[in-house]
From Swiss-Prot:
It catalyses: tRNA(Thr) + L-threonine + ATP = L-threonyl-tRNA(Thr) + AMP + diphosphate + H(+). Homodimer. It comes from Chlamydia trachomatis serovar D (strain ATCC VR-885 / DSM 19411 / UW-3/Cx). This is Threonine--tRNA ligase. Its EC number is 6.1.1.3. It is found in: Cytoplasm. Binds 1 zinc ion per subunit. Pfam families: HGTP_anticodon (PF03129), TGS (PF02824), tRNA-synt_2b (PF00587), tRNA_SAD (PF07973).
Amino acid sequence: MIHVTCNQEAFELPEGASAMDLANKMKQSHCFAGALINDQEKDLSTTLQDGDTVLFLTWDDPKGREIFLHTSAHILAQAVLRLWPSAQPTIGPVIDQGFYYDFANLSISEEDFPAIEAMAKTIAEEKFPISRQVFPDKEAALAYFSQNPFKAELIAELPEEVEISAYTQGEFLDLCRGPHLPSTAPVKAFKLLRTSSAYWKGDPSRESLIRIYGVSFPTTKELKEHLHQLEEAKKRDHRVLGTKLDLFSQQTCSAGMPFFHPRGMVVWNALVDYWKRLHQRAGYQQIQTPQLMNRELWEISGHWENYKENMYTLTVDEEDYAIKPMNCPGCMLYYKTQLHSYREFPLRIAEIGHVHRHELSGALSGLMRVRTFHQDDAHVFLTPEQVEEETLNILNLVSELYGTFGLEYHLELSTRPEQGTIGSDDLWELATKALKRALVKSQKPFIISPGEGAFYGPKIDIHVKDAINRTWQCGTIQLDMFLPERFDLKYTNAQGEKSTPIMLHRALFGSIERFLGILIEHFKGRFPLWLSPEHVRIITVADRHEARAQELAKHFSQMGIIVSVDSSNESVSKKIRNAQNMQVNYMITIGDKELETHLLAVRTRDNRVLNDIAVEQFSHVILEELRSLSLTPSL
């Protein structure tokens, strides 16, 4: 017999029992997609060993959902091959909103989707068991996939010592490291979304492929809800709203590098000004480091060796330079300009740095995926004993910042990867436990992702939920044990000796451009007043009312209210519609009555009308709404 632990409960099982056997013993096998066995993702068919710790994964767990979607990608490939046997499957990963599979030697359109979906439904209903097999060596794997040059290329690139596995469901076998569902049966709802062209390995010089995107769910109800969400997302698309509201544009001369218009810069500046006030109150100092630094710096940081293909480089006066893809190395140099003592710690250094990273053109998308963006980084230097308290301070800052925008979020703690890490076991354990204790004290929901940390330390990722329940990974808190050593950073400890500081690297917005894109979609372009590019628009009924309109505009402008005047020849109703289409928060109409009484006729963008409001009363209400960073209108 063997003894295993699941949910802090001990179980006794016979030798050779699998995770599925344990699930059956718990009478819950129908719920589970896979399992974390000793923090490693595994199939339910995995044989358990004495002393194992098991955590089952369901559709509601991110990792369980990933297993479900990965199996769905295999079902897609199997369905396509049944209908087009000469097609060549290449890769089929899980992505944020579902999955895709790339095929060579295939020409289809969306008109073929019903046939593929029907075949996928049949495959699910056939309830094929899904089994894993391991090839004895690389040669055996190459021999099996000899008719598929794409799979063969992937196999050839694997190190000799790597275990090469494949998964079988019915007549279909695919190269894959898994894990997968125990059968095709749980995939009850399957929908294809679109096709696009792609290149093998994202390289335009390689073979052209067709990419098929899809989603799947355990129930038809969940699929319908998701499709409704996709329709709502189209209405909120920041690329469409960004153009309609005159916030930003994209130009062919600079793909992935957005042009921000005056209205967009108003929103941008409101975000940045808020960020600066928040960080000043929290004890951060702000710096600015150069965008262009020489090769020597990037060699010290490790970027030149490991990240060069994503960097923009140039040679000036026979010296190699790179435009910074990250702010961290510049902050390391700033730290070294002075001597430091433990008495200064935590030392909080913040920078909104302009960074550039080369992304493939096919990956670019509005403000969400760009080649240049501003990252709101901060680097906090501290002693090991301060990690927990300072992490909690940052988590409190996270709570305040996202709460200001009305955004819900959850946290994800990623722990030490199996291989390739730096730092001692003791330091990793100390750091991970400190982050976890801070998360518990923050009283915010969090999940643990075993082995998903960076090579230089554990991290906490912040996943934001928007108005239509999509999640976006924005901020991060990373404990870095790497860069302080690479740059030989020192401080004088309490014993008067030189020590290397621990560093917390954190970003709250992440990319300001991306965060702005998220806000556009979250608010559907209807920004709260303090973020709005235009607070008030004054609309004249006739030419004789323009002088009063300009007088009011000057009055409001001097108070810090963003105001414009529409004295065009359009009808009043058309002017109001124009203002509402541009999501102006408040409209003031000036006619003969308002000219005589000096009172205001105010209309909101939701068409609420308020008459006979005194100028000073309106000013006071608007200024208070701005000051309080209110998310709801005061009138």
